[in-house]
Amino acid sequence: MPSPEFVDAVLDVVRRIPPGRVMTYGDIAWALGSQAPRAVGRVMALYGHAVAWWRVVPASGLPPQGHARLALPHYEEEGTPLRHVESADDYRIALSSARLGYDHEIYAEVAP
């Protein structure tokens, strides 16, 4: 179980992701000085409902597992770049455009 401090730190990063942009589990772990993207995934599974969970995606560019249909309206409303939209269950986030760059201030703001 992730520590309460780690949970708070992950959720704080997610709150700072701008609309229309995404970060991967690994990006969030890296921003926090952690090498544990799976721990970020665990936090999102347990507490992600409290934040914009659709802005946190796996490095594959797929929407959060089991939530593609729920996430698509959020992506469309926010203008998140998508690719290969075949249906509400079959698409990817265009990470080359949507992923928050490592030069974004969020990395400096949350770094330990």
Question: Where does each model-flagged region fall?
Answer:
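Nucleic acid-binding interface residues in structured DNA/RNA-binding domains
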Residues: 1-112
